[in-house]
């Protein structure tokens, strides 16, 4: 790093320790938390200088007092336990007569008191030197909290001359080699500010009284460390090595472990040294004081009930150690990580009382938990009430209507049964008054449906309106599914629906009339009124839609508009000139030569203006399916006409018995759009299945509701389909038996759009051939797939593809399964082919044809052969392959085949008129003279 350096990198370069550098940086006020913290180059220089200065001063000034650390003092005390009592209480150091005289002047009780005060009040003593010695400013505040007794007693003798700086010199002059070894061992340690001048007992007591307020904040950490050291005493060995090991593992353990070392030293077996300064009762007093302070600290730390459960119990050493350890780790000025977890001693608030509602709207199937939430009562209370009433339930068990009303009335609540709204009924939105808002109504484009007989020019007229070549895309020039388009005329939009004119598309014409506002009835001037023209008139009248008559092809030589007008009046369509109130507008046009087309559009706009067509674009969109198909790449595609509201991309939608989310929307020009307003035809993707043409659609609030409504509608449709199964009863028994003898042609229909498949199925079922009927096994949209081949093979069906092709795998499978696939693009050719196939399936019909008559003249009985009758042909002929009836006195006594036929002795195929011959009737020998033979054949006749 060029600009910044980490503390550990500086330590490697300078040879200093990480702790020294971190301490120096913190002293200088830099934001350094650990050895991995980064500082700038300028800050690094300051930290290095400060650390080196502190190290030098530590080696010169403070190392000697620090050498009197707990382990060394404990070791020296142990070595001189019996023969060198001067290793403790200053005797190992003090050899000056003046100092000895002053020590002798003090009584043993005063010395014990001094030691006790030094051990308990040391933080107060260390606080003063800390401010007076600039060398020790880098030491943590915690290090000054606990001080071992030995060091304090030793420093007491040395403090007679000077402060901390003078102390090392005096000690160096008077110390034994043991002290020198201690000094060498603690060179790397920081100076201990705890080695201070200890005054007389009277002075210390005065300072204690004056500094008692300052002392309180140090008591907590010191006592916690004392408790932790008490817990570790059993793990120490005789020479106190356990304390040393713990001290080495602490990164900043100078001050924290001093209190531990003091206690360890006191318990390591240095009895003589302790006795020389401490009376027998001093240990009890010290422990009693510590217990008192610990309880005070626990009370201070407790806020409305401590997590540890109040004051520490003196007799439970295990809990003391555990609680003291926890409190030691959380000493952060009341901001420990466990402070927020302290339980409150404030009593729990009582449950608020809720008033019972006057009435409750319920629905059948509610459980106890639902009722409890509604009336703000406990579920157990309701279960108890029901149990007392003799009903055993749990809180999740559904309740019937009587039980719900009973429990509500017991509480004094009036039960009101909820009226369930059938959200799957989207048809109600088209007739519901409250769905649309009058204030949001705006003018909408008119929806115009073009109707008329086949080849009367409907698509050509629309093609002129759109200025495109729509007609070229139609097979044979016949429109075979609805096209929805939108054009502009005089600044206003008009939506056109082009419907088929072929007789097979009756349902499509009815569907187009149901969603339209105006009907343009196209009639060819040379053909006049045709069957589909009459049908279109009836559809428009049934829907209550005004009719505009467009008399087309007036450019042809044989055009006769007057005759067309006369024929239309016979079917209830009158010109406005004849019936001003209910008359229809008549416009003579030529779509081929664009003659009078503007006049026709102006008439459409005029009629639309009179109708005052309006819609509410603010509501969720509703409308009708114009057409639907299945695309191999896009899936289900539906052509919709939005009638109310605005449809957006990603709207959850229910279309007929299917549902989905609007994935994409395209207009009649094939362009992607984001929204579609009223009277707009669009083509969308995203449905789960192909809907039926003519189904209604509605947008729901979310996809979950749309899914539920779609699945419910599909379930109901399936149920209705199952209910349509015919049941055999006495009324239809004869028809059922007759149908059992009737043959059927099984057909699978696959078409490009739903409307074409529907029309084709209806047309095929109308074919009437006696003895044969059409059975539509399956009808769907999309390409012919392998599953269709498998179904056809299983049901022995013929597959008819209308504007679709089979896939490669389907074609191979059809060849293997020997399934017949017929592909067509014009509907009437499909009808003719199916009708021919139906006639070919019929059993042949035969009629009896009499070819001759003969009279028996003689009979001959031949053994082992039978009776041979000699006959004379009186009319026609007798053939060998014909049948014969034996008639006696006008009664047929036998009908059978001719076994053999001979003319004289020769076998012949037939015997002509006025000739004699002999024959033998198969399985009949009772032939007599004068019997008559009636010879006939069964001849097949053609079925019509």
Curated annotation (Swiss-Prot):
Q: Which residues bind GTP?
A: 452-459, 498-502, 552-555
Q: Where is this region: G4?
A: 552-555
Q: Name one GO molecular function term.
A: GTP binding
Region ranges (G1): 452-459
Kindly give the Gene3D superfamilies that the UniProt entry links to this protein: 1.10.10.2480, P-loop containing nucleotide triphosphate hydrolases, Translation factors, Translation initiation factor IF- 2, domain 3
**Residue ranges of domain tr-type G in the record:** 443-614
Question: Belongs to which family?
Answer: Belongs to the TRAFAC class translation factor GTPase superfamily. Classic translation factor GTPase family. IF-2 subfamily.
Region ranges (G5): 590-592
Protein name, as recorded: Translation initiation factor IF-2
